[in-house]
Amino acid sequence: MIDTTLPLTDIHRHLDGNIRPQTILELGRQYNISLPAQSLETLIPHVQVIANEPDLVSFLTKLDWGVKVLASLDACRRVAFENIEDAARNGLHYVELRFSPGYMAMAHQLPVAGVVEAVIDGVREGCRTFGVQAKLIGIMSRTFGEAACQQELEAFLAHRDQITALDLAGDELGFPGSLFLSHFNRARDAGWHITVHAGEAAGPESIWQAIRELGAERIGHGVKAIEDRALMDFLAEQQIGIESCLTSNIQTSTVAELAAHPLKTFLEHGIRASINTDDPGVQGVDIIHEYTVAAPAAGLSREQIRQAQINGLEMAFLSAEEKRALREKVAAK
């Protein structure tokens, strides 16, 4: 179902949601951190979703063990490097990795700006080693409040040329976008793109707010757009992309089953929507699974899957020249 003549992208992928279980085990031993299990087989149920979680917040707790072992900046650098290696193994040509440095720093009080620098270094080295093209999206974790998000923003601004976009993720219901208007004003002033997690736990009004008040050019998940025909029309007309994450939306109980996922409807409506993983390490999936298993189960035709693959590059935070070069590079292989 993947068209090998086209670039394969993953533009909604959390670096801190893709820490390998084996790496969690090894870092736990290296830094003498107590883990809930001592073998890979017994650790996996604690760090991967085995059965669907009742809600988004429950799902997010599965990510916690991955960041609890980030006891040094070297550990952060390692997981960033491994993220690129995983992308290469999946056959991805281009990946946008998003990460929350405050979340990664929290367990061991690491310097937030230092985490940003370590991630930049690890990703850069991974791209050099594996030949994958990558850009970084900075996440503000709304769950930890406005002040913590301000600290993350300052850390990103200290490395503004290595950050492509700003995102807001976490507890959408408890911490609405209206709390972060000044943060996004500064992000736009820095020349960054804007993508926002919206319409995942909250309704279509959260998507409207992300677009109108925060300046979102893309929406992460956005499943609740299906409830508002005017919003769907607006997304299609303005070419505001939806970063769909099929398996993730089932595992968080945002959508009951793949057959009920709105991605097919979005594509039929002319909305620029793409297929992405979200937190592949926690979900136990990869981009190949999303294209070959999840997308057909969500009712997408072969042509719709191909369109979603095209959309992934069209939506990417790349210049027209960068997109053209990537298309030509893949076509020449």
Curated annotation (Swiss-Prot):
The active site is at E200 (proton donor). One of its GO terms (molecular function) is 2'-deoxyadenosine deaminase activity. It is an enzyme of class 3 (hydrolase). PROSITE patterns: A_DEAMINASE. Binds 1 zinc ion per subunit. It holds the Pfam family A_deaminase. Zn(2+) binds at H12, H14, H197, D278. Its EC number is 3.5.4.4. Keywords: Hydrolase, Metal-binding, Nucleotide metabolism, Zinc. InterPro entries: A/AMP_deam_AS (IPR006650), A_deaminase (IPR028893), A_deaminase_dom (IPR001365), Ado/ade_deaminase (IPR006330), Metal_Hydrolase (IPR032466). It catalyses: adenosine + H2O + H(+) = inosine + NH4(+); 2'-deoxyadenosine + H2O + H(+) = 2'-deoxyinosine + NH4(+). The record marks H221 as: Important for catalytic activity. The keyword Zinc applies. This is Adenosine deaminase. It comes from Shigella sonnei (strain Ss046). The gene is add.
